[in-house]
Amino acid sequence: MVNIPKTRNTYCKGKGCRKHTIHKVTQYKSGRASLFAQGKRRYDRKQSGYGGQTKQVFHKKAKTTKKIVLKLECTVCKTKKQLPLKRCKHIELGGEKKQKGQALQF
């Protein structure tokens, strides 16, 4: 499990800032797929009517994790940027910090 603080002091390249400022950290989440994207319209048109599945359904999934992407929002000018991290299975935002010599708690 990766523990990431909810705020991060990093460079902001917004017009108002162009310096290091505090950024609010959230995890990126993909939006809902549009029904009106060209590929989706073409696919739906092809699928309609008789004839079953017309395009191959992908089954050979190779990866077990996804890359974590952080969304950073500047607290001064509200400029947003994304920061990809390494792959991990679990992510925790703003969890408690580990301390040396502490017993494990479950």
From Swiss-Prot:
Lineage: Eukaryota, Fungi, Dikarya, Ascomycota, Saccharomycotina
Any one GO molecular function term: structural constituent of ribosome
Note: Confers resistance to cycloheximide, an inhibitor of polypeptide elongation.
Database matches in PROSITE patterns: RIBOSOMAL_L44E
Keywords, sorted A to Z: Antibiotic resistance, Cycloheximide resistance, Ribonucleoprotein, Ribosomal protein
Origin species: Candida maltosa (Yeast)
InterPro entries in the cross-refs: Ribosomal_eL44, Ribosomal_LSU_eL42, Ribosomal_zn-bd
Family: Belongs to the eukaryotic ribosomal protein eL42 family.
BP GO annotations: response to antibiotic; response to cycloheximide; translation
Gene3D superfamilies tied to this protein: 3.10.450.80
Keyword Ribonucleoprotein among UniProt keywords: yes
Name used for this protein in its record: Large ribosomal subunit protein eL42Q
Signal peptide: none
Superkingdom of origin: Eukaryota
